[in-house]
């Protein structure tokens, strides 16, 4: 084993995995440091909302320092992404320090709002009146900023950024779910298992299949018939949209509650229109998921920059003029790919959620299946990241000559 670790080809990947394990150890330790005892927490029956929070690295079963998870950070990234979407050139000219400060300031503001909402939603009223609510908010905000810092460090020195933290949070949430007795026939259970397997195959298809757009490469002078093509994944945004959409939905709910509580202190915490046991709440979440999936995919593809690269290199698409025509052509292709990928993921998540409205006695099992699907999707992305590092490590001695 020691000999294997000393091999130069895989030294970097092992260091990154070890660093990620250290980050996860801190996260697990912090998520077990309770601020409020379990007896002082309100019992909520909206189990999918708790599951949704866990998909952002949070936990509302107990109030701990990492209860908010990465939700405020993901929401701030969404807001900044949508603001910069219309002017990508200005966004690309910003320094990393400018982007960093904007993200952190916005994350801080959103953390305060979500902390206020979580305390009033999940902590007993008696405990809220007894304790110093501002001190509790300060602890939650500090924990969130620490977790964001850990995720940022893992992006630089570890594996797959915030995804390992979310993966551990989902596993922890799945282990806490109680499914001692399943009120369903063997045929229904078998159908659920088959549907989950089919869904996992579809997700694997989404990750592995790519759309290829052939173009004429002026630098390709080889005698072979090898074609050059522009490749995009079916869902360019990947699994990050699942975390971002949940984060946006939680922020929407907490933001509305925060604004209403300013004018009416006795406002009810339960908002039926934004709950997962109502068709309106599920529909709102799925619309957010679909729109964010599309816009994030378009943001990552960046057709405007790609058309400029084609203009500089002299490469072109057959029958398409360089410049504005190329940009319009790429926008047309990008819209098709991004809407298709976003709609496919939304349908995969939406069908089980709507199904819980018709068979509420199987809601826990269906929620468990949804979490399993999200877990596998995130695992595929993490595996893809590890494979990329292994690929670059394999050719490190060759690539070092050119950078």
Swiss-Prot record:
Annotated Pfam families: SecY (PF00344)
GO biological process: intracellular protein transmembrane transport; protein targeting
Keywords: Cell membrane, Membrane, Protein transport, Translocation, Transmembrane, Transmembrane helix, Transport
Transmembrane region(s): 17-37, 63-83, 105-125, 131-151, 157-177, 186-206, 240-260, 276-296, 339-359, 362-382
Domain of life of the source: Bacteria
Keyword Transferase carried by entry: no
Compartment(s) of residence: Cell membrane
Membrane topology category: Multi-pass membrane protein
Main location: membrane
GO cellular component terms attached to this protein's record: plasma membrane
InterPro entries: SecY/SEC61-alpha (IPR002208), SecY2 (IPR014269), SecY_dom_sf (IPR023201)
Family: Belongs to the SecY/SEC61-alpha family. SecY2 subfamily.
Subunit structure: Component of the accessory SecA2/SecY2 protein translocase complex required to export cell wall proteins. May form heterotrimers with SecE and SecG subunits.
Summary of the function given for this chain in its UniProt record: Part of the accessory SecA2/SecY2 system specifically required for export of possible cell wall proteins. The central subunit of a protein translocation channel.
Designated name of the protein: Accessory Sec system protein translocase subunit SecY2
Gene this chain is encoded by: secY2
